[in-house]
Amino acid sequence: GYAPNMELPLWEHMDAVRHGNAAYYAYGSWFDPGCSNKIFEFKRFGGKLLLGPWRHMEVYRGCDFPQSEFDWKADHLAFFDRYLKNAPSDIDQMPPVRYYTVGDEDPWHFAADFPLDSQTNPQLRLTASGGIVDRAAEPGTITYKVRNDITVFDSMGRLNRRLEKDMNAENEKCVLFTSDPLPGDLELTGFPVAELYATSTYKDGIFMALLEEVTPDGVSRAITDGMLRGRSARLGRNPAYDALGLPYHSSMKRDDVQLSPDKPTLLAFHLETISRIVKAGSRLRLAVYCGGNGFNQPEGMPEDVTVTFHFGGSSDALLRLPVIAPNVTKFEGDGETVYAFKRAVYRHRDNCWKEYPCQQVFPAADGLHFVTKDFTAVRSTKGDLVT
């Protein structure tokens, strides 16, 4: 048969695609394993990016999340009419990113770039006592025997990453880290990153992490997941990953590493991207495991393998979260909607869009100034009111 990525590898033509003036539009679904790749493509090629609350292929048939329906036919036609027919259109004047936040009362949002302007990246420490804390962790270890009887995904595997079952039964088979209850609602939009330090009785293995929300009634449900093979742990460089602040692994044989039984290896990897509101009173949980149904262990790996996770000091295990700080970007009034971002200001009036690229953005006594060639917009805050 034909193996596209091996016989015609895209990466050999990246620059030609990027600089070939082709119009690019990436559709992504938060619960499809390919969603993260859409963001990497957007960072590499530009164009437009849509991120919705769907599973694999659900963009074309919808799902049961509120306001999740999307008129993809009209969207496709508008895009192709503009770039193939050169028909009059304001599609290239719109904010390039549109995304859906699960759990938000008004779930659809625009953005001028990804990561979002207001993304922060707090570094939380994982502790040997099973905590997720915002302070330095004491040195310690957790020893874990690899097991393969963990079932996270259903029969669709990672093609269905919308996991709604209570994970507590499977969590008993994992290494768990749990935070204190959240004092307020928390928006996560972007890529979480786990940094683990491990030694192992075998030279290779698979390491998986599941970020979960534990509700006040004790139910634990998955938010997103990520994984890394031990031999691929060596960090490299990639423009798209660099632009997102993510660890990158080439997975090339020349970069192979071997896990050591006595010297901890850094296992830094991203979890799949997501946009979600975690409610006040819930706790965050990271479940770490090294095998399970639907996953094959490395060839030659013995059945009895023990992994030791290390914490504190030079083995500072971390969980970095894409927390979105409160930030008003949408303003409505007088028949017009204005969106203000660091990259550009967008005006929407009479069903027409107009983009005004920002020459500079800076804070002043009267608010945040967005300076364009045509005007300066000022975002002011007085108490709870933002104008």
Q: Language model features by range: what are they?
A:
Residues 1-92:
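Active-site-proximal cap/loop segments of hydrolase catalytic domains
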Residues 58-59, 66-387:
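C-terminal, loop-rich substrate-recognition/catalytic regions characterized by aromatic stacking residues
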